[in-house]
């Protein structure tokens, strides 16, 4: 089978949104080439050696590569992708150079092209993300392993916004909690919450592709008895009170349901928000405060911000 590789040179701010556009267009895998990977400090407790080739990364910005099957609809699909990316500017998202190139690869090249970017990664004090084809032994008794298949939609779980959410969940989720994950994507945050001891987790997403992806990952990680995955628009029609609500989505979307989050949380409940670029930090902070939340902690990683807010 022939595949078409679409390569988009953009900004850190636009990575999440463009990745979602590509997944929704039917991409069979997405690769993110971020030059930050070349200088990022990595866990070397056990003598690991990381060797990355600078030629695989842009000098500035980020390159997102997606793989689409070559068929009679390819031209139309590419045009729809271009239009959707341009529309991001309507939401004040900087798409940068937005240079788009297209090339053709065969099945074997595609299968190995994205695997080289994905290895077991320790993303927090307790969690390590492991690709499904890797054999990995926990290095301590309290290490928690999340298995993901990056050939499925919604990336590898190592984006800064996801990492900060998981770190925040580690600090806030208690045994027996009810957790709501808004915009679940791959389901990784719901899986983490279940592994941390939550009694009930509601994983919500409007995108049917995300719902199916999350269901598969939840089953893969054997937490399907705790996590319920549903197609839902934000917190619409949700009435069960929660101890923790987590949302790793665009700042503009967070502000749409901040009041609903406050209403749904129990007293002293926690609202974890991520997916916030630095330029939107103050806007989201003010929205949280207006809704009645207090900011317990602000997390930052690269150009991204996450808030841990509490209902009083």
From Swiss-Prot:
Superkingdom, natural source: Bacteria
Keyword annotations of the record: Cytoplasm, Methyltransferase, S-adenosyl-L-methionine, Transferase
Subcellular location: Cytoplasm
Annotated S-adenosyl-L-methionine binding sites: 162, 183, 205, 248
Keyword S-adenosyl-L-methionine recorded: yes
Gene Ontology biological process terms, A to Z: methylation
GO molecular function, one term: protein-lysine N-methyltransferase activity
Entry-linked Pfam families: PrmA
Catalytic activity as recorded in UniProt: L-lysyl-[protein] + 3 S-adenosyl-L-methionine = N(6),N(6),N(6)-trimethyl-L-lysyl-[protein] + 3 S-adenosyl-L-homocysteine + 3 H(+)
GO cellular component: a single term: cytoplasm
Keyword Transcription applies: no
EC number: 2.1.1.-
Primary site of residence: cytoplasm
Membrane-spanning parts: none
InterPro entries associated with the record: Ribosomal_L11_MeTrfase_PrmA, Ribosomal_PrmA_MeTrfase, SAM-dependent_MTases_sf
Record family assignment: Belongs to the methyltransferase superfamily. PrmA family.
Functional description taken from the UniProt entry: Methylates ribosomal protein L11.
Name of this protein: Ribosomal protein L11 methyltransferase
The species this protein was found in: Anoxybacillus flavithermus (strain DSM 21510 / WK1)
